[in-house]
UniProtKB/Swiss-Prot annotation:
Its main location: cytoplasm. Residues 95-143, 175-191, 223-232 have a biased composition (Basic and acidic residues). The gene is infB. One of its GO terms (cellular component) is cytosol. It is found in: Cytoplasm. Residues 395-398 are annotated as: G3. Residues 340-509 form the tr-type G domain. Residues 95-155, 172-256 are annotated as: Disordered. Residues 144-155 have a biased composition (Low complexity). Residues 349-356 are annotated as: G1. Keywords: Cytoplasm, GTP-binding, Initiation factor, Nucleotide-binding, Protein biosynthesis. Residues 449-452 are annotated as: G4. This is Translation initiation factor IF-2.
Length: 840
């Protein structure tokens, strides 16, 4: 060991000797001069003192933190690299002696507790073993006694008594024996170790002789708690996992399980399979066998799903998914005083029979002049105050395209005025109006119009309508016939009187104090005001600010206008109004109801939208599958695509129905887009993408749409009369049909003789019997009226002169191109092919 003096140590640590001596004295060292020797232990004591004086009393640091940093380079691609730096930090903490002592004490406590638990378990095992030994001895004694009694008496009765007597004490060992039979020991080595460990702590250890005398005791089954985690408590290892029997927790059913399947209006294949507890693939396979190829996510309608479930042997419960609708209907029930309301009268009849003119006279306003082409193309709703009371009129279109509008008018009405022109008679739309009125169960009042014309024949009208089961009152029927003239006003008062008389008979009632309820007559999209719906209030009172639910649309009534465009605050029964504030244009015929709050309205509207979409998808797919073979040749059809925009919903429906009905097996019309309102930029883009024609019915295109139409050269047309659209589309379809080639026979020549020519070969000397024979036209050679050759007439001569044509009754020589087998008696037929335009 190297000895260092105080002076040398001061030089090493770079401190004055006096200061070092002072520090050594403070540390309790005996050094007083610079020449004294300092040992290593004294250096350590001095260092410890200095650390303590600087605030660290511990001889070693309690916490050490090590930091390590590694940098690697990662190639990203090409010559580009990225440096990746990984920093790791570890902290080591030295525990104090107090903590070490506390942990040691805790370990000792745990060890003592474990030994105590082990001792208690050993005592329990010994007690259990003694109990089993006693039970075994009792069983053997009972058996020996039973055997003695059986030998002593031959009767079976004592034996039975003995069995009954010992049944109770041997119940438990019998169960043990049964379990041993069922469950062979799978791990003998482990069981022997457990037994040896259990017997280790027993107090009584028998000698070798006793072991020879006493038979080996039965091993008691270790009881495990049925609801435990499957571990056996006890033993040195804490808990050991028991071997469980490899047995399923359920058994296969002996028979088919019939389940109750709830089916709503629509259900997917996957949902149906889940309710029947079968795999989706099974249902798909079954439906393939039924002839309906489906996918697992396909929506089935109620009837199809019911058929599948019943075929698979399950009970079907048809569920109504209209809980929201039922709640809404329940909330709309209102009791109040009913009062007499004005009748709603629909004016129906054939086109140009004077319906609007009659209304015009009643209203004292010129309505018909405002209609395009003088025909009605919307349902107009008006209410008129007469001397005998108020009457609400609905004016329906008479054109064939507006069938749905007329049906809608009949459903919303109380009385139908059937207008028939006295000079025209019963026409197709007249018959249709009668059918709609009878289907709706509405009484008919016949107005025989235009009686001021000299050719008017009212009796002819009565005969024609009697054939449709509309019997005049004077013939014993119930339909009043009133002759009127909308031009002169003749009979109009009598007509109104007849209408009001019918209304009195019907006893029409309404409750004005109830929330408003009605039907949508018409709807349109106004550029400045948004969706506008014409509503006929049928019951209750509709007020401005009410929250209304209309089909799949809802909204708050922001404003109400009467038929003259004047704002009103409320509308009672039988009053037609225009309402603003809906979130979309409802379909004509949708029911309008006033609901309590916006939340309820939104909830029901969203429910209806989802339901409508599901049903539509299900029906569309079913239609595709049913017509799969019919549609195999559809791709060969030529299609005229149309984007159609109209001013009101009713006209749009009428046009879509009429245009879709046009076409035949070769051409068809497809309305790729339709809507209410002006032609927008998106409509123009749709027409561009689908190669469609843009039709605007009483609407115009905005600036953006016009720009696209001009730039892309799209075909855009405006119309205000429905006839014109239908006629133009028919012409377009006719043009798409192309033309047919038709053959016209020009003439027939009979072969009288055959000559040979070195230039043309066989020349037929003929007599033209019919028509005219032309050179360079296609011909047919007929022998016994059977075509044997078809070719071209190459040479035509008369008296050695080439001619262009030969008339009937003249002789000529005919040379047939590439044909020499002409015989006397053959006929040569000259014809031409003409293109003929086809029509629908």
């Amino acid at each position: 060991m190297t000895q260092v003096t105080v002076k040398e140590l001061a030089q090493v640590v770079d401190t004055p000797v006096e200061r070092l001596l002072l520090q050594m004295r403070d540390a309790g060292l005996p050094h007083t001069s610079a020449e004294q020797v300092v040992t290593d232990s004294e250096k350590q004591a001095l260092l410890t003192h200095l650390k303590g004086s600087h605030g660290d009393r511990a001889s070693e640091p309690r916490k050490i933190t090590l930091q390590r940093k590694t940098t690697t380079t990662l190639k990203v691609g090409g010559s580009k690299t990225v440096s990746v730096e990984v920093r790791k930090k570890k902290t080591y903490v030295k525990r104090s002696p107090d903590e070490i002592e506390a942990e040691r004490q805790r370990e000792l406590e745990e060890q003592r507790a474990a030994e105590e638990a082990e001792r208690l378990k050993a005592e329990e095992a010994a007690a259990r073993q003694r109990a089993e030994e006693e039970a075994r001895k009792a069983e053997e004694a009972a058996r020996a006694k039973a055997a003695q009694e059986a030998a002593a008496t031959a009767g079976a009765e004592p034996a039975v008594v003995a069995d009954v007597a010992v049944a109770e004490p041997v119940a438990k060992p019998a169960a043990v024996e049964e379990r041993k039979k069922e469950e062979p020991r799978r791990a003998p080595k482990r069981d022997e170790d457990d037994d040896r460990r259990d017997r280790k702590h027993t107090q009584h250890r028998p000698s070798v002789k006793e072991k020879e005398k006493v038979p080996a005791p039965r091993v008691a089954p270790r009881s495990t708690d049925e609801e435990s985690d499957g571990y056996r408590r006890g033993g040195r290892g804490g808990k050991s996992k028991l071997k469980k029997r490899n047995q399923h927790g359920f058994q296969n059913p002996t028979g088919p399980i019939v389940r109750e399947v709830n089916i709503g209006e629509t259900i997917t294949v996957a949902e149906l399979a889940a309710q029947m507890s079968v795999k989706g693939a099974e249902v798909v396979k079954f439906m393939f066998k039924m002839g309906s190829p489906v996918t697992i996510n396909q929506v089935l309608d109620q009837e199809t799903a019911q058929l599948v479930a019943e075929e698979l042997g399950h009970k079907v419960k048809l569920v109504s998914e209209n809980a929201l609708e039922e709640q809404l209907a329940e909330s709309l029930k209102f009791e109040g005083e009913a009062v007499t309301r004005a009748p709603v009268v629909t004016v129906m009849g054939h086109v140009d029979h004077g319906k609007t003119s009659l209304l015009d006279y009643i209203r004292r306003a010129k309505v018909a002049a405002g209609e395009a082409g003088g025909i009605t193309q919307h349902i107009g709703a008006y209410h008129v105050e007469t001397e005998r009371g108020m009457v609400t009129f609905l004016d329906t279109p008479g054109h064939a395209a507006f069938t749905a509008m007329r049906a809608r008018g009949a459903q919303a009405t109380d009385i139908v005025i059937l207008v028939v022109a006295a000079d025209d008679g019963v026409m197709p739309q007249t018959q249709e109006a009668v059918q709609h009125a009878k289907a709706a169960g509405v009484p008919i009042v016949v107005a025989v119009n235009k009686i001021d014309k000299p050719e008017a024949n009212p009796d002819n009208i009565k005969n024609g309508l009697a054939a449709l089961d509309v019997i005049p009152e004077e013939w014993g029927g119930d339909a009043p016939f009133v002759p009127v003239s909308a031009k002169l006003g003749t009979g109009v008062d009598e007509l109104l009187e007849a209408v009001l008389l019918q209304a009195e008979v019907l006893e029409l009632k309404a409750t004005p104090s109830a929330p408003g309820r009605g039907v949508v007559v018409e709807s349109r999209l106004d550029k400045g005001r948004g969706p506008v719906a014409t509503v006929l209030v049928q019951d209750g009172t509709l007020r401005q600010g009410d929250m209304v639910l209309v089909g799949i649309n809802y909204g708050r009534v922001r404003a109400m206008l009467d038929e003259n465009g004047k704002p009103i605050k409320e509308a009672g029964p039988s009053i037609p109004v225009e309402i603003l504030g809906l979130d979309g244009t409802p379909d004509a015929g949708d029911e309008m109801t006033v609901v309590a709050d916006e939340k309820k309205a939104r909830e029901v509207a969203l429910f209806r939208q989802g339901k409508f979409r599901e049903v539509k998808l299900a029906r569309a797919h079913a239609g595709k599958l049913e017509n799969i073979f019919e549609n195999m040749g559809q791709e060969e059809k030529k299609t005229l695509n149309i984007v159609l925009k109209a001013d009101v919903r009713g006209s749009l429906e009428a046009l879509q129905g009429s245009l879709s009905g046009l076409g035949n097996d070769e051409v068809q019309v497809r309305v790729v887009g339709g809507g209410v309102g002006g032609i927008t930029e998106s409509d123009a883009n749709l027409a561009l993408a689908s190669n469609a024609v843009l039709f605007g019915f009483n609407v115009r295109a905005d600036a953006g749409a016009r720009k696209i139409v001009e730039a892309e050269g799209l075909d855009m047309r405006y119309y205000n009369v429905i006839y014109d659209i239908i006629e133009d589309v028919k012409k377009a379809l006719t043009g798409m049909l192309g033309s047919d080639l038709r053959e016209n026979i020009l003439g027939i020549a009979e072969v009288r003789d055959v000559f040979r020519s070195p230039k043309f070969g066989a020349i037929a000397g003929c007599m033209v019997t019919e028509g005219m024979v032309h050179r360079n036209r296609p011909i047919r050679v007929l022998r016994d009226d059977v075509v044997i050759f078809e070719g071209e007439l190459e040479s035509l001569r008369r008296f050695k002169d080439d001619v262009a044509e030969v008339r009937a009754g003249m002789e000529c020589g005919i040379g047939v191109k590439s044909y020499n087998d002409v015989k006397v008696g053959d006929k040569i037929e000259v014809f031409e092919k003409v293109e003929v335009a086809r029509s629908l």
